[in-house]
């Protein structure tokens, strides 16, 4: 949430109790962008002040996500690097009469905080003797200390209009072993107490935070005032101190960015995990097939302001389309197949047709796709009694088969329920792509795969996770807002052999359908593809 500019470099700080989402990506792009602009280096700092919510899994995934976005950091730091200094600073504050041990319950402390329009009530322990406070603070950092039995609070101003100034908690007891320091510590600093001081210790010049940290800024400054007093530099308060600056966070329509709600989605198995392709997490977007360049392009387009805004998911998807159009390999896949038999094509004969990998980039070359008598086409591409403006396959009309021949439909076969099981057509032998006969005007072009030279595949389609534009602002239980149609599975699709060999990380365009990527579940025997985004924004049309 907070990001640090240091002399000749930038500091990016992250909580290590969850996975990064696209909102974090906006901050990361700013940090590394500033470092690049001023020929500096970006360092990372992990806020590991709450061992009960942290583990190395989160650290490893955060580092992977930052690398995937295309950034390289300088050094990696942890708030735990400064636990000794923070402890000494807290002891100094107690000795100066600026901090005390409070043995009230969390509920009692919250009740005594008051409201924004009424002052708080002083704790009965506020004027506890300094020596007693020091002894109890030492007791907090023992294995016998009971979580919630006491906290260290700063003695500031219980009548201050800023609620964060009303004797904030500096330390609490946590008996969970720390993933770096083990059982050395049993009392841990609060984030508000640790991050400003860590900035000061590192020589950070500016702390760039999201807008919810605006009311925290006076407290950030106050603790640094105390720290400069401890260091004997209180006479020059404005020298060599970090300053906090805020910018707006990234919010997207039809999803949530709240870490609590994202945890809830995962814990209640409402999604398949943190990398569910419907999630706004970077690992989810990567699995779905979003490119890091498209995410950075989107973030650059919305900019940084002082006003919170709700950004349309369609803008992000437009950036994804724009980027993938330049890099995705074009392949053929049939999601809802129906058999097409070319009745006048020689039995047992095949041809290798040349297919351009990407018309946007000639250097990507070509591949071959096998053509034969028996093909699969999309069921929706055939209509027996078609309206005038239906330019796909219908009896008596010609269509072009992509990269192959012009064919004319001659009829179809149905089962006892009237369901079409086979379509028949005749091909024009001199209309092959590249031949002179292929130049005649035919309005419809269909994609296809050879029935004997394709691979059966599973295709997963995703849509908006929530039905409402701004679920975070809706007062209803967010379970009621989930989109029941956000996931569809198509287990009986067919893809050309060239597509079946593609791996996660390789961008594909299923021609006339959309952009896709092989899923982590994909195998050579049963390829699995995730739909990244359609060629057009169908959601907007559905919800007009």
Describe the role of every protein-language-model region.
Residues 1-122, 212-242, 251, 256-258, ...:
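N-terminal Rossmann-like or analogous alpha/beta NTP/dinucleotide-binding catalytic cores
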Residues 1-7, 15-19, 41-47, 52-56, ...:
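Basic, alpha-helical terminal appendages of large translation-related enzymes
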Residues 10-12, 181-183, 279-282, 502:
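Short hydrophobic "helix-edge" motifs at membrane interfaces and signal-peptide entry regions
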Residues 26-36, 59-66, 183-195, 199, ...:
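Structured alpha-helical segments in the cores of large, soluble enzyme domains
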Residues 47-48, 205-208, 280:
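Short beta-alpha connecting loops at secondary-structure transitions
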Residues 96-262, 320, 329, 336-338, ...:
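Active-site cores that bind ATP or allylic diphosphates and position pyrophosphate for catalysis
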Residues 239-319:
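Long, charged, mostly alpha-helical binding arms that flank functional sites
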